[in-house]
């Protein structure tokens, strides 16, 4: 079953909604996630997915989308290198799926991010490890976050005082990243909720 990049995005959104809420998204919710102007565009992609057997359509229901059982077991998407400026869950970033279920972590994980570099080594997050990430912007001082500063995505410990945010490495060789929210753009992609060691993947 070969899907276009956009169809894969729609399928990932459906899986995420089912994992998080227990039911699939509406057409309007899919359209909003992907920036479509109307639910009709989402409907077209859903029909294409149904033709390819990736989903089943249930007529007459706003959430009438069903995932075949085999499709529900793909697990969490593994996000590799994130291209500057593009959404972290964009299809081109997904390099694999891991069969761990989201509920293995608390709060539940939405995806696994492959860690680059050794800036968090002192708390055991090493280059090549997978960081389980819960998608949220509601984070607190001291938590490990995935943050986008400008066009770069980084994993750091979060600290905020007023309009100043510090993204702090757990490695004395790396200086904190200081962000003045009055002048710079900062977006929190999610909260780190667990680590899968690179060595555990083999």
Curated annotation (Swiss-Prot):
Q: What class of enzyme is it?
A: hydrolase
Q: Which CDD domains match?
A: S24_LexA-like
Give residue numbers for the site Cleavage: 84-85
Query: Which keywords, in A-to-Z order, does the entry hold?
Result: Autocatalytic cleavage, DNA damage, DNA repair, DNA replication, DNA-binding, Hydrolase, Repressor, SOS response, Transcription, Transcription regulation
Q: Does the keyword Cell wall biogenesis/degradation apply?
A: no
> Catalytic activity annotated for this protein?
Hydrolysis of Ala-|-Gly bond in repressor LexA
NCBIfam families associated with the record: lexA
Q: Which family does it belong to?
A: Belongs to the peptidase S24 family.
Name of the protein this chain belongs to: LexA repressor
Phylogenetic lineage: Bacteria, Pseudomonadati, Pseudomonadota, Gammaproteobacteria, Pseudomonadales
